[in-house]
Amino acid sequence: MELPPQIQAQLMQLQQLQQQLQMILMQKQSVETELKECKKALEELEKSSSDEVYKLVGGLFVKRKKEDVKKELEEKVETLELRVKTLEKQEEKLQSRLKELQEKIQKMIPTAQ
């Protein structure tokens, strides 16, 4: 059975939305992983009794003040948390659009037969 062009177009749009959602989910997972690493680094930094620590910069370890590194990590955590929230909002919008489109397609299919 050949689907009408209108349904085919809707199915293509559905597929594009699914791909967008997959990309958002992959980005979110990546950002969440980086966020966990930053939080773990902050935890380890808190355990250190030294005023100076070594930070990896472009393949080299550079001695830095503990407070400077801590501040950088806290800012990075804040930025990453914001990014996760943004991605979650995008994910919710895409999920909603996907659901609406699926319902629309299901309503169209019985009329096409």
From Swiss-Prot:
GO cellular component: cytoplasm; prefoldin complex
Tree of life domain: Archaea
Record's keyword terms, sorted: Chaperone, Cytoplasm
Pfam families, per the entry: Prefoldin_2
UniProt-listed GO biological process terms: protein folding
Any GO molecular function: unfolded protein binding
This protein's record includes keyword Kinase: no
Chain ranges passing through the membrane: none
Subcellular location: Cytoplasm
Protein family according to the UniProt entry: Belongs to the prefoldin subunit beta family.
NCBIfam families, sorted: gimC_beta
Assembly behavior: Heterohexamer of two alpha and four beta subunits.
Its job: Molecular chaperone capable of stabilizing a range of proteins. Seems to fulfill an ATP-independent, HSP70-like function in archaeal de novo protein folding.
Protein name as it appears in the record: Prefoldin subunit beta
Organism: Methanocaldococcus jannaschii (strain ATCC 43067 / DSM 2661 / JAL-1 / JCM 10045 / NBRC 100440) (Methanococcus jannaschii)
Gene, per the UniProt record: pfdB
